[in-house]
């Protein structure tokens, strides 16, 4: 062998070494150990247990036939993954674009690329693992990367990159359009591990997935996952036909012990969602762009101990979103939900900042009295939401939806929801049904730009400790009576009155005056009378008539109590009726009523508890001026002057149609 040939061989060998040393060195898990951030009282999330990575257990997909010019590299990549020994190793995806995912190239029935235990899948900088186009890839819940592996646990797996130029691309645009066109398919998650433990996903980008991006566990069978510095990017579900992505959940969790931090997620469904058996889930220091927010459900059975902290949202459809669904057979998807904390949230351009829906999706009745009358029997699937804390949450602008929307179930109320230092500004107010102990504290404030703060309060209790829901109206007369009619109505659109009261309704209807009367028109709808702070109503007079002549009308609900058609009826002959409603205990904050009619015209007179100990007051029929009467209607002094009242015994007297008290 001559000297020139030896030099050529040595140079070739040296050229191969730096690539491995720089791009293929496994960084270990020291950074993750230092970033654990385990909440007090929780067990730490376990990290993968892996061997030392050397050239002997590192496998480059190019060595198994993969090529950037190939139409599909599924078999070549799988051969590299299969080459990893039972003791563990690393598979390297070099820089370049690598097409994979054709159904006819799969070697497994459940995964396109199947990863076994103690494997590191490493995407180099500039590497793109790209799914084949729609029509060539499997579309029936097949996992694209990971382990479905029924009956087989997969442990100690790492999928990692070298930053945002390490990309997994699902080419989802054609899939999303197919869904809009009514084509039937059900794509699996891009990355999914159903069974096993100790998973680590870090430092790469997923974009344009056909469906869910990352799924951890199935029925609690997988646990202990750490996901950090992962970017997820799909269009919003509201981007419009041909542009929107659909059902592209960011990270979906179905098992215990998961840490997620330093992630940037924008998509077309839940940014991060906890479903059945998600427990001890800690999400922190994340940015959520488009998507449906920090979500729970709609499968919520056995979800416990979830903490989202330091979340910055911009353009998210929902902020904090909790929901329990109803199956097609009518059974529920809940049971055992408890202990959530959402802290240090900043929301910008977020439509619905805080919602819980136990009738997901919108299976509740517009009149909650109907839902209450149809309460179902409790069973193991009934949702039991309890102990929910929002702390240091604020919106930076006006949200387009409801400030707060909480709908429990009549047979199982949402319990113990605390808003601690929460400031929300929204176009629409608060709607709560079947909620026990909603607490506002520590500088919390709800501001509404359109209508009243309280839209609906049905079969619910709350405690506003800091004036969070105060309307800001001040009234000097807290005793009343207070009349709500056209004479005291100051704003038809807002439904506000000169005496500090207001009336709101779900449909945003304005308040018009009945022709030739002082009555206000009310259509079939539930209305909420907003009572000023410090006022407690003990009695209400209702005066008015039907505004149509084709059928009788009536008020079917007052303050959460349902009434039949004969109790507070307004006949079709349009005769004026007067009714008095007395409340068993003083009503404060809000009072609801629901007309059942095309349209009634009504006025309300509200009374507070001003009891003097006098059981009955006799109406005085006499009209003679300058006489003084006692409360029995007897003349105690004729042709009197005002100064004559001073000579009377202690008591209450009527003089010239005014009441006087002599002490």
Regions found by a protein language model. Give the residues of each.
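Extracellular "leader-to-stem" segments immediately downstream of a signal peptide or signal-anchor
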Residues: 2-117, 127-202, 218, 223, ...
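Short glycine/acidic-rich loop motifs that flank beta-strands on beta-rich extracellular proteins
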Residues: 102-103, 131-134, 171-174, 179, ...
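Right-handed parallel beta-helix
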Residues: 125-126, 155-166, 197-208, 221-238, ...
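Extracellular beta-rich repeat passengers
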Residues: 319-470
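N-terminal targeting leaders for non-cytosolic proteins
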Residues: 470-523
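Short beta-strands within extracellular/lumenal beta-sheet-rich domains
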Residues: 513-534, 576-580, 599-601
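Short, surface-exposed beta-strand/strand-loop-strand elements in extracellular ectodomains
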Residues: 546-562
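C-terminal outer-membrane/trafficking sorting elements
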Residues: 611-663
